[in-house]
Regions:
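Residues at beta-strand starts and edge strands
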Residues: 6-10, 23, 56, 84, ...
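Beta-strand/loop substructures that line and gate deep hydrophobic ligand-binding cavities in soluble
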Residues: 91-149
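Short amphipathic beta-strand and strand-loop transition segments with alternating hydrophobic
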Residues: 1, 46-51, 75, 104-111
């Protein structure tokens, strides 16, 4: 097992044909219609916004990853127009039961020129202690769990 417990890392970038000044990731993310979230990926089932117990903005995302239904409770740690960082202790509902995975989601935009910018979507999923106990109980190796994502 890797010492950092990484299950998966993914970064996707896209060129936006608009000046950086016109991009507001935080506004888009926390006002994203459910239908638009679903159009972003066939794996996306639904999304909505709420607040944490301490009042921080949250987005709840439901999607499938591998053989798991994921309910992600993303709490905003940084919420700026050009950069957002959210952390979720996500519920992973699998054929063998339910467990938890930590997911860090970072979205950013940077200027390319006066007319375009680059959007970046970075996801880093890590095993929690509960997840490690769950896979051990179910006879699944860490490498098998990682490959299932």
């Amino acid at each position: 097992m890797t010492s950092d417990r990484t299950l998966s890392i993914s970064t996707v970038t896209h060129i936006i044909n608009a000046p950086l000044e016109k991009v507001d990731i935080a506004d888009w993310l926390f006002n994203l219609p459910d239908a638009e979230y679903q159009r972003c990926s066939r794996a996306h089932i639904g999304a909505g916004t709420t607040t944490s117990d301490d009042g921080r903005p949250m987005t709840i995302n439901v999607e499938t990853i591998g053989d798991a239904l994921m309910v992600q409770h993303f709490v905003s740690e940084v919420r700026e127009s050009k950069y957002c960082r959210l952390v979720s202790i996500s519920d992973a509902i699998t054929p063998k039961g339910r467990t938890k995975v930590q997911v860090v989601w970072e979205l950013s935009a940077k200027k390319i020129n006066d007319h375009t910018c680059e959007y970046s979507n970075h996801i880093h999923a890590r095993a929690t202690d509960e997840f490690l106990a769950f896979i051990e109980k179910n006879g699944v190796t860490f490498e098998q769990a990682r490959a299932a994502r």
